[in-house]
Amino acid sequence: MSRIVLVTGGGNGLGRAVATRFLADGDTVFITGRNAGRLADTAAEIGAKPIPADATHPEQVARMAGELGDDLDVLVNMAGGNTDFTAAATGTQADGPLAELERVAAAWRANLDANLLSAVLTTTAVLGRLRAGGSIINVGSIGAEYASTSYGAAKAALAAWTAGLSAEVGAQGLTANVISPGYIAETDFFRGRLTGERKARLIKATHNGRAGQPGDIAETAYFLASDGARHITGQTLHVNGGAHTTR
């Protein structure tokens, strides 16, 4: 039976890969993103339904939810990324203790909005549409385990929130889990800041000696939404080739 799937941040990278995987199974897939042009191009190329929306803005999330229809089976909260890589200078450029605090506050709020609030808002907006047997899949990061940055903290908070969410929605027949990727090649996550030396270190840290691929994350999301994963909930699945282990 065809499912209805929503993938936030579906215009490129991992979101596009996840959307493509569900489409291959005959599902109806809605993709959202801030870049309306790129979203439309991706939708036309892969056969998805685009809804331009910034997942950090309540009014845009509410509008997006209204365009979905009444039913939903799978929610993949992919929207996010390390805003430290993409943001222009934020806050005042003045010197002094207050100016520094304002810059720190702006940087932290940006990553928390992009990586935590986006998932919370989207999930809240569509929760009543998710049918029994449905799945909520949030995408975290290995940075939640190692990065002493606002990005790592935001992804750690996402995992903690997901565990609590699982307890809340279990009685409705829903599951909620986190996929935590390690280094994934063929994406623009690092925005041109990944040096060859660091890339080599990231690959060397794995047990299987290779970078992750978008398909690794797409297949994991597809599995978590399958009938075979109905007793998996409240968990963080690490997809990193052994770069981080739970024991």
Where do the model's predicted regions map?
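A conserved structural motif in NAD(P)-dependent oxidoreductases
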Residues: T206-I217
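Active-site helix of classical SDR
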Residues: T123, A154
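Alpha-helical segment proximal to the catalytic Tyr-Lys
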Residues: G128, A167-E168, R230
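A glycine/serine/threonine-rich, flexible loop-to-helix segment
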Residues: A89-G91, A171, I184-T206, T246-R247
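Short C-terminal tail/terminal secondary-structure segment
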Residues: T233-R247
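Catalytic Tyr-X3-Lys loop
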Residues: T92-V120, I137, L158
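Conserved glycine-rich cofactor-binding loop
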Residues: G9-N12
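Short, small/polar-rich loop/turn modules that mediate ligand/substrate recognition or access, typified
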Residues: G170, T175, I232-G234
